[in-house]
Amino acid sequence: MAKLAFENDEVPVGAVVVNNGEIIGRGFNQVIEKNSISSHAEINAINQASQFIKNYRLKNCDIYVTLEPCHMCAKAIVDARLSHLYYGAKEPKTGAIESIDKFLDREDINHHVVFSGGHMKDESSELLKKFFKSKRAKKASQKNLF
């Protein structure tokens, strides 16, 4: 899923929602394509899974994401009542699970999600580095045109 985002010139983050070993929702970043700040991979995967089971509550489902979720996505994961979150690379600037905040550890949230990070982190990090390196190179070449 992250590779699809990369191919579409979006930040390469992908997510899947799984129920009993079956993928019921897939998503990748489509913020630019959809002109929507909420079209993050996690939310797109959650929306697809909710449509699939015809319920916004995804009890007994897990979500796998290539990058540590932001606050918006962490809240969506809680509200969807997902059981487990597995993510790849840490996000030092906006990661709300372990990096800049520990949102899922809060006592006052209405549902607690078990989480684990570092899954396939090298692959996730490499794709992100490649994406941002190409963005910087493109920006530098555009500066040289003027």
Walk through the language-model features, giving the residues of each:
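Small-residue (primarily alanine) positions within well-ordered alpha-helices
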Residues: 2-5, 15, 25, 41, ...
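Conserved Nudix-box catalytic region and its N-terminal flanking loop in Nudix hydrolases
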Residues: 33-36
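Zinc-dependent deaminase
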Residues: 1-8, 56, 69-146
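Helix-adjacent hinge/juxtasegments
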Residues: 38-39, 43, 47-80, 84
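Short beta-strand scaffold segments in enzyme catalytic cores
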Residues: 13-21
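Short beta->alpha transition motifs characteristic of CBS
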Residues: 24-31
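Short, basic and Ser/Thr-rich N-terminal targeting/leader segments
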Residues: 9-13, 59
